[in-house]
Amino acid sequence: MTAMDHQFPSWIVVNESTSISREQLNYLLETYNVFYENQKNLHILYGQTEDGQLIVEGMLDIFWGVKRPIQLKIQDEKQISSFDLLNTPETFSSKGRMTRWGEFDDLYRISELDRTHVLASEARHSPEDYLSYHSTLTPYADEEPESPLLYRTMSEAALVRKRMRAPEMYRKDRMGVLSNHRASINGHVYDHETSIFTPTFGSETKVRANSIMRTEEVIKQLLQKFKIENSPRDFALYIIFGTGEQRKLKKTDVPLLQRLLQGPSKSNARIFLMDKDAEEISRDVAPYINFHFSFLESILQRLDEEEKMEIERIMAKFNTERAFILKCLQSKQAAKTETTV
């Protein structure tokens, strides 16, 4: 027995009705980490908190199974930086508040920019942008224009280019900013038109969890990772087994320990984030889930027939026993009458 065995309690609580011993935990951790031997970042490890409490920590696989649409937040906790094309101080409010993406909408206009700003912006464009521009607009000549009218025309052409390129560059900047502040769901990040959507069923994500985090805390962690506005109370965690059984985790469950109990293989069991009112599927019903509807109907018909036959058998037995009892009562009553006489 090691010194760590003396420090930590002998039993680890999984939920209000389930606990595992230290020996079981060590075995489960060893099995899990051997399974992911070549993926060290997926290992689940244990240590202790400052107050000496045992804690298990690692990455928890969670699969999307929600049916109700989810709402992505319109903004992140950090202020969004200006996009490359219009990065002048006047672009943003002087107040130190959070910038909403919608505030960029009024930037699609032609403002009076001097020639220096125009040339500086062109120097930052990629060769593809340069070719795209010069395929539709006349390039600048090496020498200065011969008349102010020509200079004004060329300047406006560059400004038109700036306005035409702004939406694409804005989109690139917006996607870049988002990647620094939120995780994407299957490549989906916030968009005004698709901010409300439903993730693909069975798509996988990961969240860092520990043995102190109960079910609701893990849900909050997941929603925070993707900046989802929906309340954690709208969702629940379910374990879906390879047999088809679907069981809802209790509020007192520790999802990370439940993952350890089911083993590392995702083919045996997976943890899903689902709507809180999703139905549970018992172990007895689970084997029939994947059968064809017509086959299930034939099974029900067979069960109905067997039920009717069983009812008829019981009724026949009841009538036989009832007749026998009545006959006995009648014979005893007749014997009593004869004795009295």
Curated annotation (Swiss-Prot):
Covalent S-S links between cysteines: none
Gene3D superfamilies: Phosphatidylinositol 3-kinase Catalytic Subunit, Chain A, domain 1 (3.10.20.90)
Keyword Secreted found: no
Domain Ras-associating, first and last residues per copy: 190-278
Pfam family, one: Nore1-SARAH
Entry superkingdom: Eukaryota
Domain SARAH: 285-332
Function: Involved in the induction of apoptosis. May act as a Ras effector protein. May suppress the serum-induced basal levels of NF-kappa-B.
Description of how the protein assembles with itself and partners: Interacts with MOAP1. Interaction with activated KRAS is still a matter of debate: interaction has been shown in the mouse, but not in human. Lack of interaction with MRAS, NRAS nor RRAS2 has also been reported.
UniProt-recorded name of the protein: Ras association domain-containing protein 6
